[in-house]
């Protein structure tokens, strides 16, 4: 499925929704549920995040306007299709997100076919509307694969999950196939405490296409200022481990990822990254957990919930004295009003060494996001 086809599919549902065509039949047959979210805000950053070294840049952003339709029929079948629209400075982009059909078998066993997220990384699998920070960590953005075309089988119990899939990148089908798998388990899971452990791995075929990791260092509208070496690659191996601990109002998560990439000439290059993040709720609330993921907060009080967030993320994209090493320290404050409105304020302090684009890679950044779910 090419990009243009994805855009058309994503927004073809809009007139159907407006006419009320998507609804339950009321007879226990096919049912449909329409939902989505709008995330918008402001990014302000210094020379670090600008490849030309501009000292001060401010952008209004539409981080994502997502529309999602979930279908279910019979006792075992379901499907989902969603599309998103983003505005990043002068750039506007519409794309197809998930588009799959799924069969649910006995004992929580499921088979999925279509386009969806590969089973890799706790943070990557978490919806943007459920994140604690303004963006996913630099490590997740750099390493964890996103949505691809494929087929996947998995089992999703409340305290343990596993998934295995065969995929092809719909944006670059010439890159070949990938095999990706993830397992997770919560050996401790009670009303007040959760301990989550997980691991994932992926083998990826590149067919001697150009390979380079590029990242905007956790600011959506910034330039891709953190980069690895660029070369033609044959294949890569990706691995990650993850852990999470929730105790009453406190939630701590961490992931470490490593990727080995084989160049056309046969030598292997190695890149690594990771993050640790903590969130402390100042109100009498806690983040729920289910089936290998920490979910979004639903405040108990009509006055909402407040959360303090801190994160440190780092990547080492440097090998053979080529590429960059970078880190970002983030502090933030979140406000949750009901289950549908979230306000995120982040302050980011980045550092970089090795090869860099900006002539003066200094200056911090601030981001503000308003997320509304419907």
What are these regions (language model features)?
Residues 21-23:
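Boundary at the C-terminal end of the N-terminal hydrophobic targeting segment
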Residues 1-9:
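Bacterial N-terminal signal peptides that target proteins for export
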Residues 27, 53-55, 211-374:
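Outer-membrane beta-barrel pore domains
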Residues 25-46, 54-207, 275, 279-300, ...:
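Outer membrane beta-barrel
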